[in-house]
Amino acid sequence: MPVIESKIMINSESFKKNQEDHQKLIDEIRTLEQKIADNSARSKAKFDKRGQLLPRERLKRLLDPGSFWLPLSTLAGYKIGDDDGDKNIGWGNSISGIGYVAGVRCMIGVSDAGIKGGSASAMGTEKALRGAQIIFENKLPFIQLIESAGANLLRQTDMFIKGGRSFANLSKMSAMGIPTCLLYTSPSPRDATLSRMPSSA
């Protein structure tokens, strides 16, 4: 394979201008991501009273200390439906990404119960389906921490069919021999369904 040599001149004014412009966009994304975390953290007093950890605290304890974490679909649902991009920003009411657990690279999903009880949303479902696609392509083990109020019934028409596909994907993972671990951190309306899935462990 021939070597592709870069012709980018990192000391040029145009490069510096592009770098500056892109950094502003990256900073904007990081600010939005922090708003989502802050929105979830507003429920800390409620979680503390119940003796529970916030979703991101659970995730931190699950991951190998100091290990790599790649968040995915961080702005899923941004300004869609009742997401106003500010105080009601939700990230699809879930956290998704790739990280290491006991030295094994895994796809991890976490219900963000700090936001609307972790209720499933249309874009949260899309986020889960994208995660499943990555699992199938890379044969990644799947870990999900579940504390969810179930589906947002006001948006049920937007997610019913694709929500069913997420359950089908769990069965497909089982058939492919992909390790799957679903952990309930609180009783959930999804318990009755997921407990009967062949891939649940």
Features from the language model and the residues they span:
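Terminal-region recognition feature
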Residues: M1-C181
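Conserved small/polar residues in nucleotide/adenosyl-binding loops
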Residues: Y184-P189
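Hydrophobic alpha-helical segments, chiefly the membrane-spanning helices
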Residues: L182-L183, S195-A201
